Amino acid sequence: VQAATERAQEVQSIIGAWSDEPMNMCRTPENLALLEKVRQSTALKDISKYLGRFREIFAQAKKNSYAYGRGETYSLELGNNLSRALTSELAMLATPETIPLFLRKYQQKQIKQYRRREPIYKGMGDIICCLDESGSTEGDAAAWGKAVAMTLLEIATEDHRSFALIHFAGSSSCQVDIFRPGEYTLEDKLSAAEIFLGGGTNFERPIREAIHLMESEGFEKADVVFITDSECALSDGCQQELQASQAAHHFTVTGILLDEGQADMDFSLKPFCQNIYRASELTSDALVLITHM
């Protein structure tokens, strides 16, 4: 019985993470081929552990119409609508000590919740994700970062935006995968997810690749997400190039630290990131905000 349960959980994890129809658990030819592919790849199985959950978070956000345009600030309100409550509020239900506090806030309509919005489209730009694949990220950090990247790809595609994934490690290790809406397959996505470069860390190569995409590949309205676990300084020349490009294209750089709780790791991102999040502190609510730049 335990083996059958574990097998069913594995199927649900893989289909929920990678399928174009994550709620369809039927033994279709597409699902069977997907299961076989992912089962043969340790990297894809590891990513599945996080990706399915991330897809659920954003599906719920979309269902509840938390649609915010590029550069628009999200807003909260107080109430007792549990479908729009922040996950940090619902977390009070997890322990007996905080349940009375939650119930009191619920009765008084003091639950923090998203202000409901009508679905809107405000011409959001493309997304460029720079993903650190140096040797130090191998394991859970690499799987978590790749799951974030794959979620950003899905969101970009749904919004008819282009997406670029810049895999980076040392100064000579860099690979770029470009995904245009309607022009890539599931196999393309799986292939990109399996890539792992290994080696050292260099921030300048991915920064310059991102600038090149904006200037030469039609990503001039893109924003950048920069995911890393490492510390690396940019030269004055590279910082000047980035500042000039930001002035010309009006984009932001959002940094995500795979920090494992290390308190002082953000200093190397501060010179070029307008927003910095820590993986160790990210809530479901913060994950929603990262994708609505």
Language-model segments: residues:
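Acidic/polar low-complexity segments with low predicted structural confidence
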Residues: 1-124, 284-290
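Von Willebrand factor
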Residues: 123-180, 185-227, 232-234, 256-265
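A generic secondary-structure signal
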Residues: 151-155, 209-216, 244
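Arginine/glycine-rich "motif VI" loop of SF2 helicases in the C-terminal RecA-like domain
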Residues: 156-158, 219, 245-251
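Acidic, Ser/Thr-rich peripheral helices and adjacent loops at domain boundaries
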Residues: 177-195, 273-282
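VWA/integrin I-like adhesion module and closely mimicked acidic/polar interface patches used
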Residues: 197, 230-280
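C-terminal helix of von Willebrand factor
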Residues: 202-208, 265-293
